[in-house]
């Protein structure tokens, strides 16, 4: 700390301090030069000259990179000694009683220019609204493989998607988030008519060719950031049934069956809450509820309750693996129905990760729907660029009513820049409707994604 001074006097104080240091150092060097030594006088003079030049460089660096801050008021805890007349002393003495008091001081603090700029930017960021964009264009083609002629055979499809999201800090450990999404184009799902979506960008969105509010919520962290609460319009698939390598349609698999477990049953985003307990030891527990119908008349209609526990393991000296188990209930059919599922991802090496999902849901008095998926992702190995990744996944869906679907997808995600990615996909899907001849398709596709 340096004593308080007016802003106009700061440069003078700085120069005076530097001049005093220079004189002191020069005097020391001169005194040393007067003492007998083995070196010649010319060597001493050269040494003195070098040290003076070094000090001048330091003065220049100090003046160009350091500033004195605006005066700051600080509160300092001090101990004083008070006699019977109330007079305060700084030293103990007869008849003096020690007391603790607080004293305010106005001081300057020397800062580098970069520190000052960082503080200003952090302060501005905490008071402003952050805006981000995640945009994608997906091109797909459908080629029928087997079965009777279908309307999708030979057709091309294009879907453009743009997410504009806003974030703002409201208080300590409390943020606001909103995501507005717009879709335009035609995915192949309208003509293929499969059990799951071949383009996961349209999942849980009702209308296309218009803007939709995907999410809007407030999140806060409590109990030393071990408990997180999110309330508003939410998408519970962001909190439940996670998977490290099969959970993101923007960078991983494009088919929705390899992004989310269809046994979760969530068809639309809606009002809800998510609570997460994470003690930072590899274990976490989650609970949430969400309405999944835009035509519901009250919060009790089409209401889903979900709970999940997860644990991080390193079995058999392998890499890290996360194992999750979830359970849900919903009344969207007019009666309470239940479902459960698991999701796991396990690293075998630093580059290779396996994944698997399973789920089962009540579909009627004596009928259950079932689903499973398996696959892998290879990253930073057998790739073109160091940050590229590719994967292969298989998913099987069987409804209690008798319909079934098999889906196989492979993709290669090419990292173009830090903000742009280009991926290539090839999907083979077989639809097996009850009582109707099965039909299968090859669906090649290209996805361009940019985020900024």
What function would you assign to each model-found segment?
Residues 172-176, 225-229, 281-287, 315-323, ...:
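Repeated loop/turn-to-beta-strand initiation elements of outer-membrane beta-barrel proteins
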Residues 307-399, 410:
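Detector for outer-membrane/organellar transmembrane beta-barrel domains
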Residues 2-4, 20-23, 29-151, 169:
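N-terminal periplasmic/intermembrane-space "pro-region" immediately following the signal or transit peptide
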Residues 154-160, 209-214, 267-271, 301-305, ...:
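Residues that define the transmembrane beta-barrel architecture of outer-membrane proteins
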Residues 376, 440-452:
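Outer-membrane beta-barrel "beta-signal"
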Residues 139-161, 169-216, 222, 296-301, ...:
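Surface-exposed loop and membrane-interface regions of Gram-negative outer-membrane beta-barrel proteins
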Residues 189-217, 224-304:
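Surface-exposed coil loops of outer-membrane beta-barrel proteins
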Residues 133-141, 178-182, 229-233, 287-291, ...:
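Transmembrane beta-barrel strands of outer-membrane/channel proteins
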